[in-house]
Amino acid sequence: MGDIEKGKKIFVQKCSQCHTVEKGGKHKTGPNLDGLFGRKTGQAEGFSYTDANKNKGITWGEDTLMEYLENPKKYIPGTKMIFAGIKKKSERADLIAYLKDATSK
């Protein structure tokens, strides 16, 4: 399990420009991530996803996020997420720990 505080810093630096995590938070360029864990790809209500995201058909969890966040465009070809990914596994683990905590409140 990663470090939540380190993960929060990574989120602020790399993700918060396009995503929010708080319950009832607005969609930005990317969807609000509240309730992310256990939700299928392309299912955040009120966000316009690509067909690639809607049709991927996986459920978000630690393992799927670990793979996705390494290289989003490889994991979901056709996604509109313009993020290159996080190559360091420890940084992905920290971010996932933060997301698990922040999106389930």
Swiss-Prot record:
Function: Electron carrier protein. The oxidized form of the cytochrome c heme group can accept an electron from the heme group of the cytochrome c1 subunit of cytochrome reductase. Cytochrome c then transfers this electron to the cytochrome oxidase complex, the final protein carrier in the mitochondrial electron-transport chain.
Modifications the protein undergoes after translation, according to the UniProt entry: Binds 1 heme c group covalently per subunit.
InterPro entries according to UniProt: Cyt_c-like_dom (IPR009056), Cyt_c-like_dom_sf (IPR036909), Cyt_c_1A/1B (IPR002327)
Subcellular location: Mitochondrion intermembrane space
Species this chain originates from: Struthio camelus (Common ostrich)
Record carries keyword Heme: yes
Family to which the UniProt record says this protein belongs: Belongs to the cytochrome c family.
Pfam families: Cytochrom_C
Coiled coil: none
Protein name (record): Cytochrome c
Annotated residues for binding of heme c: C15, C18, H19, M81
One CC-aspect GO term: mitochondrial intermembrane space
GO molecular function: electron transfer activity; heme binding; metal ion binding
Residues the record lists as N-acetylglycine modifications: G2
